[in-house]
Amino acid sequence: MLVNVSLAVAVAASLLGSAAAAPLVAVKQLVERKVNASPDFNITFSSSHTDGLPRTLIMATGGTIAGSSASATDSTNYRAGSIGVAALVDAVPQLLNVSNIDGMQVSNVDSGSITDDIVLLISKLANKALCGSDPEYDAVVVTHGTETLEETAYTLDATLMCDKTVVVVGAMRPATAISADGPSNLLEAVTTAVSPASHGRGVLVVLNDRICQALYCAKTNANALDTFKAYEQGFVGGPLSTKPFFYYPPSQPTFKTVYDLSNVTSLPRVDVLYSHQMATFDGVNASVANGAKGFIGAGTGAGGISPWAKQNLAYVMSQGIPVVASTKINNGVVAPDEDPAAGSYISSALLNPVKSRRLLQSL
């Protein structure tokens, strides 16, 4: 069912043609590469400067961490993205003992409203902040809603062109809630981001006293504070008294691939198709007519889909549109078929459907 090729190599030419971003294999090569990012830093908040402290750029996008409610006991009916980056920093004065802070309000929405353009902008700004020939910052922290946090975190991990640290952080309770988790999460995120021990680990997700690698991290519970996990791979560490404590020396995930998006101005549309018994995927032709350039199948088990869905996917693949087989199961690998002639789906390997989508867009 699956061709014996990696997702990273198989679809680059078919998705973006000659404009495809070039894959970079060795992390050491990334440090030497120059980044030509075009967007400017529109700083909306700057802390007083303290000599000797590192400099951190906080890019705020909204989400529950910036949410508010009329009741301190209400952790469900609240307005996400109602508090600005300056208020987030002001609520945690201990941040200024750790780092000089510049804040940028990239957006202020719930994470379900985050667009491809916002994610691409964050990627370009992170590279400009950290990876240029004369970087302005020592670390980047992105505040984000938890619903799609893993998508943005993974995109940053797959597009950051140096070994400096980006941390993505959110909260499960709004800022107005009793025992709001946002302030402590933000302090731990900044402390982790500026720590030299965090270098060379890729993009990290920090929530609820846990540090998780972005490639493997996923939201696993709709409500609980301890929601972000990497079931099979485990956490890489956890903050102790807000300072990061890592369980292992710095390393990168085995299946990590990094792509240079510095010259990419927009991301192609890629849709995720959820499989089930008697799934047909009848809507794929309409999606193609409306601009879809690729599809991810959130398959049953190890990437399975129904015979009726296969018929529709076979048609769009005949038009040169790539289809990636992933799985809606939380863990496991969608392996390539041993017989390349068995079909033309692309294996997602360890990537879940939403991360497969982001990688396909980046190729």
Enumerate the language-model features and the residues they cover.
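Internal gly/pro-rich beta-alpha loop/helix module
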Residues: 168-241
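Short acidic, glycine-rich surface-loop motifs adjacent to enzyme active sites
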Residues: 133-149, 290-302
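Fungal secretory targeting signals
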Residues: 1-27
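Accessory alpha-helical/coil subdomains and C-terminal extensions
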Residues: 53, 59, 67-69, 84-95, ...
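Short Gly/Thr/Asp-enriched flexible loops that form oxyanion-binding sites at enzyme active sites
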Residues: 142-164, 305-314
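A glycine- and small-aliphatic-rich helix-loop capping segment at beta-alpha/alpha-beta transitions
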Residues: 72-81, 148, 154-167, 182-188, ...
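C-terminal non-catalytic interaction/assembly regions of soluble proteins
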Residues: 21, 44-48, 302-363
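ATP/NTP phosphate-donor binding region
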Residues: 25-129
